[in-house]
C-alpha cells in the first residue's frame, strides 16, 4: 500500500534512485504521508526521513498535496539529518522568481506542468499544442530558476522532449510501467521516470549501464 511504512521500507531496498511519497499537513500540524485529506492515522514524514538516513545515496520526492509546505518540509529534513540534495519537491509547489529571495531554493523542484498550464491535460493530444506548451513552460522555468518539468507520459512526445531539451530543461515523466515505453524515454534522455514496476526499471537501467 502506497504511503505506508511497509511500502517505504520496500522501496528503499529496491535499488531505485528515488522514492516518491504524498505529503500534506495533518490536522495537528504534523507532516504526514497521505494523498487525500484524512482523519485516520497516517505515517509521519519525520519517521520516513529518519529511515532515509540509512540510505544516503537515495533521494525522496515529496509530492506536495497542498500549497505552502515547502519551508516546513525542508526544515523537517534538516532536523532529521538529511541534506537538502536528498529531497526534492513536486506537486503543489509555488516557485519564487530568481530575482527574489527564497529560503528553500536549495531544494530541487520537479515542477508539475499543470501548476503553470492548468488546462494542459484537458487538451486533445496534438503535437502542436504540446510543442507550444513546451516553449511556454521553458520560459517560465527560466523565470523561476527551475531545471526539471514533471509531466504525464502522454505529454512526453518527441516534439515536447526536443523543445524542452533545446531550452536546457530536463524532464521527469510519470507513470511509466510499460518496458518498451520506459526504454524509449530513457533513450530520449529523459532525466527521471516514475514507475510502479521498479524491478523492470532497475533491470533496464542495469542493462543500459553495462552495455
Give the role of each language-model region:
Residues 1-211:
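Phosphate-group recognition and catalysis centered on beta-loop-alpha active-site segments
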